Amino acid sequence: LAIVSDGRIFENINMSSRARRLEKRLRREQRRLSRKYEMRKKKGGSTATASANIEKKKLSVQRLHQRLANLRRNHENQVIHALVEQKPRFITVEDLNVTGMMKNRHLSKAVSEQRFYSFREKLRRKAEIIGIEFRIADRFYLSSKTCHACGHVHSRLKLKARIYVCPVCGYTEDRDLNAALNLRDTKNYRIA
């Protein structure tokens, strides 16, 4: 979810065993609900009016959706609290092209579950309340591809390369931490 320039890493809640277990249960319950509707349709019943068992199953699916949403929201709030409780002078975030990421069918589910905009807006509001300057880095600033040590832009860096190795100076760092350090020091930003 977030990597901070001081090296702290906030994990993606959707990769936790608890979230995966809930998603697995949700898929199972949705399949059961779908089968109930299909059986009702085969028997000639109206799908507009649901039986008591269908209503119970719909309620259990809704509860699971709510539990997953609460789990994600809680994690989001905990991360935001951890970020602002140390009262930094400023917080800089990337202006991500979420619309473009949503067009990639391999990324779209993960991106929508992350709720980037919601996270950024909550963080902005919290920073504003506390009095922390909130910066949004330019969308086209190459934070991941720029070497933090020498400033060289590694234009051929692929997304699957998780370790950044500068071809000029040999600087080696975790790709996301390198991006966090670059975002901290960037002059390409606007204040939100």
What is each stretch, according to the model?
Residues 1-192:
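Positively charged, helix-rich recognition surfaces that bind polyanionic ligands
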